[in-house]
Amino acid sequence: MKVTGLALVPPPTAADLPKVTPELLASVLARYSRSNEGLDAIMAKVDIANPEASIDRILKFVDYGHASIGGLTGGLAIALDGVSMWLAYKIFEIAQMADGQESSTRYITMDAANVPTAEQLGIPTDLASRWRDIVSRSFAAYHAEYARLDALAVAQPDLVRLPPDAKPIVVTRLRKNYALDRARYFIPFATRTNLGLVQTSRMWAVTVKHLDSLPHPEARAAAALIRAELIKQSPRLTRHSFAEKSYEEQSRQDLAASLSLGLARLSSVPLADEVWVQVERTTAPFLAETQSVAEALNHRGNRYAQQGTATRRMRVSFAWNNMAIAELRDLNRHRTGHRYTPMIQAGFYLPHEITPAAHAKLLADQMALTRELMQRGSATYVYSLLLGAQTPFEHSTHGDKFIYEAELRTGMGAHFRYADHLSAALRAFFAQVPEARAWVVEGTAEPE
């Protein structure tokens, strides 16, 4: 694992603008809101060569981690190379205010060498060899199915749903995607990936505090490395980034709930799809909603356009019983509202193009290892999971955000499986909000 902080420098066109460090910016703007001096008078106290003394002169509240001040640092960029897919998932779950990107699965090395060591992850020593064996066999299954599906797509190009007049380079890319999108369920959740995030110092402090409070050695190691980079740009606010009792206790309870449910439901049999959608449209008696859903939606030119209050005030909660981790990694990045999963294996998804019986021994051994880790109460059971593991997943948000997600995740370029999940959620949504059907653009996940 390698963690790197990136420092922004102004472009040449901004050479004449006042210069501040992230925490100096927070101090200046905090003072700006607590005086009537005007910006020029405050900036006159700034010595960019000595930002710490400048902060002391302007406003020291930045020391105390006040949320209203810690968010004024602007975005701090951090890149994490070589973290497990699980840790990348967890960081996106925690860092809800961050802008970020993770390496696309198609660019990741699919090899047992591209996985952290058992020691780095905290896998119990006596189970390490079994875990390494599962990882190696899982990658072998991935490569075997990928090669078979790629050859099948060459022999039967209609399977790929190629656009008319597609150029050879596009044909090759879509064929490779066809194979990857179906073979990926054998990829270990422990596989290394990379991610980069940008968020304020305040939110970084919360993220690192949360990571430092988790029982996973990898998470705590990441917390220490991120903190070491943050100190270079935001030393005062980084003081508030250490493990804290409430975070540790909630993490302990979360793990206990996952272990209990995970052992009760552990299975490698695919779960039939179930979806649950709850729409809440009640309003305060003194602030009724008067706009129609049609009027809230019919002025949009695309999914990024503004929606009206009829959908923006509507609360929508939705959940699936069997979201494979492969799809969950994408849906987890929708930042609005709250997302929750116990991260268990209640079933195992394979597309119809793959015969489960051919991999029955691998999945039985993988499930046995997961059970052993769970029975020991080990948080490292997550590293025994493959991307085909199916877990319940819940997301609560507002109507406009749900509609955006449904249109995005069924639209062009969407993976066929999460398009299935969002289409099912849309059907349940339309049953409760039928007037939205004419205005929501449900896609067909055509390749791009």
Placement of each model-derived feature along the sequence:
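A conserved ligand/cofactor-binding region detector
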Residues: 1-448
